[in-house]
């Protein structure tokens, strides 16, 4: 859970900016968007396969550039 302790002299805008960074870093919004609607098991499997393929291609591309 994202928590931000606001100091006495800290402005609301700065605290809000820090809170947004923490939320983004923890992936709360992306998780919320992913869980917004029911995802069928077949769709979940396809999404995971696409992500794995994307990671593999990225690793291959990185390896090719290094050579």
UniProtKB/Swiss-Prot annotation:
Keywords: Ribonucleoprotein, Ribosomal protein
Pfam families: Ribosomal_S21 (PF01165)
One GO BP annotation of this record: translation
Record carries keyword Ribonucleoprotein: yes
Superkingdom of origin organism: Bacteria
GO annotations of cellular component type: ribonucleoprotein complex; ribosome
Family classification: Belongs to the bacterial ribosomal protein bS21 family.
Classification via PANTHER family: MITOCHONDRIAL 28S RIBOSOMAL PROTEIN S21 (PTHR21109), SMALL RIBOSOMAL SUBUNIT PROTEIN BS21 (PTHR21109:SF22)
Database matches in NCBIfam families: S21p
Protein name stated in the entry: Small ribosomal subunit protein bS21
Native species: Hydrogenobaculum sp. (strain Y04AAS1)
Highest classification ranks of the organism: Bacteria, Pseudomonadati, Aquificota, Aquificia, Aquificales
């Amino acid at each position: 859970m994202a928590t931000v302790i606001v100091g006495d002299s800290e402005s609301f805008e700065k605290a809000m900016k820090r809170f947004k960074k923490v939320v983004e870093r923890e992936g709360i919004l992306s998780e919320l968007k992913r869980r917004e609607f029911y995802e069928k098991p077949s769709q979940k499997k396809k999404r995971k396969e696409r992500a794995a393929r994307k990671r593999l291609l990225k690793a291959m591309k990185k390896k090719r550039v290094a050579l």
